[in-house]
Amino acid sequence: FHPMKGPMTTQTLKGMANSGAMHWRGDRSNGFFGVHADDAVLSFKNFAPAFEGLLGNPEPMSEGGMQAFADFMLQVQLQPNPIRNLDNSLTAAQKRGFDFYFGERPSDGILVPEIGNLRNFVKSHNCNGCHTVDAAQGLYGTGKMQSFEGISQIVKVPHLRNMYAKVGRFGGAAVPFATAPDTGHQGDQVRGFGFVHDGTVDLLAHFFTVRVFQPTLNSGFPLINPNQTRRDVSDFMHAMDSDLAPVVGQQVTLSADAGQRLAAWPRIDLLIQRAKTPFVSKLLGGQVTECDLVAHTVENGLRRGFWFDAVANAFVGSDGSRRTDAALRSLANVAGQEVTYTCTPPGSGRRIAAVQ
């Protein structure tokens, strides 16, 4: 309850490596160890005084201590989006939201250019103009810039990768700057806070009724059926892209049981397909595939591990031996030789496949 900030929701500590300045206001870009608007490591280290002022330490954390903490914390990433389809496709509603988000219709905003750089003046934006999605730059909703929203302070444009985690605060009162109706009491709640910096909004579709998004002839949500587009954009934002593809972490075991094989077979096909599919992630080094597929089994009493070589279309054992897809699946025909397939983060397949 800072006298200037007021109450604000706690932001996730995951996935911060490429998002620039931290805090809702981006204010940690200027602090204890220096000033830089785009340096996530420095911004993280500038939290050092909080260990004294908020947590009761006798003094701020040392720079060495904060550097070690930053080295660890900035490697922690957001999990794959649990709403996005496992083949990374969009539903019809999500695709409509995607098309509006990246479309030509301005939704809100005037870009204030740097002094002396008027060539970059843009009078209006689509959603992506402020909430930039660019996997090659590691941006998933934040362009690292600040915005003036007509509230008591200037805030940084936040990322949008964890909107699904904010669902659960149901209902809200009507407010003067939006057209969403007063919902009345909605019963038991899952979360105490919802969307935006202070957690006061229950649904993204309700947030999209604020004045800056109001439908006009050439800006805001469409004049015809705006609520449908609001819901579509909400659906897309709940399925937002991230550094890890949706298939990462998926696992299936193939056994000799006929019914189980019938269910597992198409899932294995999917995992192999996604392990071949190109994917872009700055965090993972740029151009990769959606996952590294590994398989583990017990063959003739010995534990075996394999990683999928997408170029050769074969499974490579930790001992260097190779198996075709069909040959590996056939091992599971024998009870006790079940084969477990796992889509692991790109770059980790060989390590995870290795049997110690």
Predicted feature locations:
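Periplasmic c-type cytochrome electron-transfer domains
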Residues: 1-356
